[in-house]
Amino acid sequence: MHILIYSYNYHPEPIGIAPLMTELAEGLVKRGHEVRVITGMPNYPQREIYDEYRGKWYVNEQKNGVTIQRSYLRIKSKPNILDRLLLELSFVFTSLPQVFKGKRPDVIILTVPPLFGTLPATIFSWLYNCPLILNVQDILPEAAVRVGLLKNKWMIRTLTALEKFAYRAAHTISVIADGFSENLVNKGVPVNKIVCIPNWVNINFICPLPKHNNAWRHTHQLDGKFVVLYSGNIALTQGLETVIEAAVCLRHIKDIVFAIVGESRALQKLQEYCLLNGADNVLLLPLQPREKLPEMLAASDVGLIVQKRNVISFNMPSKIPLLLASGRPIVGSVPANGTAAKAIELSGGGIIVEPESPNAMAAVVQDLYNNPILRAKLGNQGRQFAVENYSLEQALDRYEGLFSDIVANRASSEGILPKFNVSKG
């Protein structure tokens, strides 16, 4: 089967949707499919084009059997609303010529956000007369409005219209949690158009490892410490000030260290907040290379999932499967009625505390510090749940089955538009 993945983010970006789409593409290739990826120049999370791609309009690559077609992005490191719009539009226009540089796909899968990617992907779908599968990782503009990231009324109206168009244009919509399905059905999307395939984790890559003789611990002088780890995106939805304030509450326990790993620029503001609050038990570190991820997770005693109170209920952090697979207990400072809380509770791999409550977070961390048996129990339950529900192989099975069903059903009837064969062979 020829599969086209249209994703703004892809390897070598270390966090977010990029590792997931990379694993999906490479996993499908290993199963005998031909996969082409149309993507932008790598820039996340620094919001700067990586050095080796800077100044280039188009780059074609082959990695682990996947054909990668990159196109130019207009990007600013500190974007305003106009910059964000121009960034997405630049990808729309520069990625369009890529349609002429590959075989006709049997299916197209588009990751959202960004929403504007719907436009070229839909054009591809029409030209190729093949089904478009919308892979929804976040529901926009609703989620951005809720946390105050998007306030411009014209932009909200535009994105709302684009959201409706995307749902209509897609043959199938894959979502990552049941809460997404409920949201879409409430917006009038037919329930039979939606399939839930959770984000996954490579359980062979991320697995429980001993924290003793751990090189990551040794490098950062954490030997003998009780490490509470937050690693990932630092954005409006997180509110990591809560983590720093919780660390201050536990300064009297010298063994406990909080480690926050994220993009360097975002860490600068947290550094100021640490100094202001006297949080000398917080270690701030830049994002680590992906190959260091298993070692870093193994270095922790507890993993954190952090959200603000106003985060929309269906938000589902992709780091939850990672932490569960690592065999470390989770402390989820998240809204109790949200998708993240439900996922953690269902896994049996963590404890939920009130969001934006440093005292609540500190109390649970201290309880886990004092109770190694509970830590082991939660970690083991979380790992087992990840193996049974979040493995990469299960996700590949479900996507492969979805693609096959869609292609088989369409094969019985001719499309309205003619097939557009770009190349043969």
Regions found by a protein language model. Name each.
Residues Q238, L287-A298, G303-L324, P329-K342:
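Nucleotide-sugar-dependent
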Residues L222-Q238, I244-A247, A259:
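Conserved donor-binding/catalytic core segment of Leloir-type glycosyltransferases
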Residues M41, G179, W200:
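Carbohydrate-associated surface elements
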